[in-house]
A protein has these predicted regions:
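Short, acidic, small-residue-rich periplasmic hinge/interaction motif at the N-terminus
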Residues: 22-60, 68, 135
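Flexible loop and strand-edge segments within Gram-negative outer membrane beta-barrel domains
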Residues: 24, 230, 234-243, 253-305, ...
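Extracytoplasmic beta-strand/coil segments of soluble accessory domains associated
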Residues: 68, 72-109
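A beta-strand signature from Gram-negative outer-membrane beta-barrel systems
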Residues: 125-172
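Periplasmic-side early beta-strands and strand-to-turn transitions of outer-membrane beta-barrels
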Residues: 139, 155, 188-283
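Membrane-embedded beta-barrel scaffold of Gram-negative outer-membrane proteins
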Residues: 302, 306-318, 437-440, 466-526, ...
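Gram-negative outer-membrane beta-barrel transporters
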Residues: 353, 391, 490-499, 518-602, ...
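C-terminal beta-signal and adjacent terminal beta-strands/loops
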Residues: 501-502, 544, 597-604, 620-669
Length: 669
């Protein structure tokens, strides 16, 4: 059990000690007043496949508070949000499923062999410097072997300490209070230990009652109203503590980094609202820990090596005291051991090749009766090559994946070997490289998770592995101007086709922690992603940036012509979705407006009227003011979310909050 009083006292003492010191001038980059507007491109021409990126300053302007909040603004991403501060939040890329998306935290993949679902609501943005999304895979051949196997990848990079001349430390505090009795406090301390080594410590406390008003309205199959009332969402409280420590080191032609991370929480799970039942007795405790190390060094101009190691331990307790259901009180303990080595050799100045090997071991224990305690041994070997000409770039790779599961009775199950190739190409038609045309084809693969296969009540040992074929053609145009009205313009569009075989889909089954698993067989996905951004400076000191993102997806179940849902859109995938962001920066003021839209969709396999879900949209506003008192920089932000108080569900029967408010104070020393 978390000692709440001790943690709060510890953070308070830390703050009091810091404020008692006489501190020199601060040079934190995102809160200083800037007299001259400087625009720099975020799109790296070295990338074969351009990425989508949000950096720390942009994340601050969005008033996103978790990684999940930020990912809503990427094209091709669908977010599953169960509502409220503590609701589980997972992401899906291009309708292929969460398990095809790799998520790396400071260069090391986050794992969950139990159900494959990474709850991105657990990861705060207060220490995050950049989030990058790659479709296909990261445009680099020096990467862990398993990274070559994903259909898409998200890379979360935390802040690296940077110190001004003569300064040995940086301090940051952030406090936010908002609707649902939400209070979030975080602190970051960066310390220079030597000319080559620095440390950083980040800690955060989050608490909320999770209560918010919502409207519940449901119709019968004949169209008459079954329920129409306003109620308060209950049992959505959360208490969470996150702490992270890092050591950063620089060596000759390389670097190293060591990380300790812990996340502990207790939360209520409000559950689905079914048959006019508003409150359920579900609760969940998470105690997650991991430690990881990363080392990279170049030897001369030709050879570079990288090594990664990680150990993770996840302890989850799930309790359901709902009197209408079977009493449940189970604990799940998951361990992961991971090692990776990757090496790249420059055969010629324009031609390089890499070889990578990963080993991963996972084990799941539970106090459930007759639980089989599965262990998974996975080996990954990747061979890749890249050719980089002045106006043409191409990369190719092949990944061999070898997986074997062992159960507690000593038997082996679900052994397999799979080869997944990929090829990426990019052409710059003009010498300016403002316009690029790219294409890729890739095969990806994923094993069923432990829950898919072995969960005592709903596991399906007959599940087949899931594979996907991806084809993508796109173009990107970037233009910058050093002066004048227009400063930066970006346009990026992709047309893609994905074919998923033996697709595994997880549906919420009344309880948020449990799933119903099945193979759909085959799904064909056709889509278009469009993203554009424009920055203008109408008058001196006034910076206006607009960003639009649109996604069209047609994802059809084509398994069996005899099925009633043959060629129907798969659940929870809207045909049309998009976001719009407008940011206005003038002197010490920042105004931000963001709009999110998700079109019509269905919540079950059959596309019938009863399963139809209407489109939803939300508008969020924020206004912030920056100022300084002596050498301490402050930023105060007020925000209004869901301005028009729309009633909507992202997941059926999980109502989202109506209009809600927040007030944030940032202090940087």
């Amino acid at each position: 059990m978390i000692n709440k009083a001790a943690i709060v006292l510890l953070l308070w003492l830390m703050c009091s000690t810091v404020w008692a010191q006489q501190l020199p001038r601060s040079r934190f980059d995102s809160i200083q007043q800037v007299d001259e507007v400087i625009i720099s491109s975020r799109y790296n021409h070295k990338e074969v496949i351009p990425s989508q990126t949000l950096n720390g300053e942009q994340l601050e302007k969005l008033n996103a508070h978790s990684v999940a909040d930020a990912l809503r603004y990427f094209s091709g991403i669908q977010l599953k949000d169960y509502g409220g501060v503590g609701g589980i939040k997972t992401v899906n890329i291009r309708s292929m499923g969460t398990n095809h998306l790799g998520i790396s935290y400071d260069g090391v993949e986050l794992g969950n062999a139990q159900n494959g679902q990474i709850d991105l609501g657990q990861f705060s943005l207060d220490n995050v410097e950049e989030i990058t999304l790659f479709n296909g895979q990261k445009s680099a051949i020096l990467q862990p072997a398993s990274d070559f196997g994903h259909a898409g990848a998200i890379y979360i990079r935390t802040r690296a300490p940077r110190f001004s001349d003569g300064k040995g430390y940086n301090l940051k505090f952030k406090a936010r209070y908002g609707s649902s009795d939400m209070f979030r406090f975080s602190t970051l301390w960066e310390q220079r230990l030597s000319s080559k080594v620095s440390s950083s410590v980040s800690a955060e406390v989050l608490t909320a009652s999770g209560k918010y008003k919502f409207r519940y309205r449901r119709k019968k199959q004949d169209g008459t109203v079954a329920y129409d009332t306003t109620a308060i969402r209950e049992n959505g409280d959360i208490w969470a503590v996150r702490a992270e420590g890092n050591l950063h080191g620089m060596i000759s032609d390389g670097f190293w980094k060591f990380k300790l991370y812990t996340y502990n929480s207790e939360r209520g799970i409000p559950g689905a609202i079914v048959n006019n039942v508003w409150r359920r007795g579900e609760r969940q405790w998470d105690h997650n820990y991991f430690t990881q190390a990363r080392f990279q060094k170049s030897f001369g101009e030709r050879f570079t090596t990288q090594a990664v190691a990680k150990y993770a331990y996840y302890n989850t307790r799930y309790v359901n005291r709902d009197t209408t259901l079977l009493n449940v009180d189970n604990t799940y303990k998951q361990q992961e051991l991971y090692f990776s080595t990757s090496n790249v050799y420059n055969l010629l100045p324009i031609w390089s090749a890499s070889l990578s090997y990963d080993f991963k071991w996972n084990r799941l224990d539970s106090d459930m009766r007759q639980f089989v305690t599965p262990q998974r041994y996975a080996h990954y070997v990747a061979l890749a090559s890249a050719l980089n000409l002045e106006r043409f770039k191409i990369q190719a790779s092949v990944l061999a994946t070898m997986v074997k599961d062992r159960l507690n009775d000593g038997t082996s199950s679900k052994s397999m070997t799979e080869y997944t190739p990929a090829v990426f190409a990019n052409v710059y038609p003009f010498a300016s490289k403002e316009l690029s045309i790219r294409a890729y084809a890739k095969k990806s693969f994923r094993m069923p998770t432990f829950n898919d296969l072995y969960y005592t009540e709903i596991g399906n040992a007959l599940l087949k592995p899931e594979s996907a074929l991806q084809y993508n053609v796109g173009l990107s145009y970037d233009r910058q101007w050093p002066s004048g009205l227009f400063r930066f313009f970006h346009l990026q569009t992709d047309v893609y086709y994905n074919s998923v075989h033996d697709k595994i889909v997880a549906y919420p089954k009344g309880q948020q922690f449990r799933w119903t698993m099945l193979n759909l067989g085959r799904v064909h996905i056709k889509g278009i992603d469009v993203e554009t951004e424009l920055t203008v400076v109408p008058v001196s000191g006034l910076l206006v940036t607009g960003r639009l993102q649109y996604t069209y997806q047609d994802a059809r179940d084509v398994t069996d012509p005899e099925d009633t849902f043959y060629r129907d859109q798969i659940p929870y995938i809207p045909w049309h979705s998009g976001t719009a962001i407008l940011n206005i920066q003038y002197k010490k003021w920042d105004f931000n407006y963001s709009f999110i839209y998700a079109g019509e969709r269905y919540n079950q396999q059959e596309n019938i009227k009863y399963n139809y879900m209407q489109p939803w949209y939300t508008s969020d506003l924020s206004l912030s003011y920056r100022f300084k008192i002596k050498e301490t920089a402050f930023r105060i932000t007020g925000e209004v979310n869901n301005v028009f108080s729309q009633d909507y569900d992202v997941i059926l029967n999980y109502p989202m909050p109506k209009r809600n408010y927040g007030l944030t104070l940032d202090v940087k020393i």
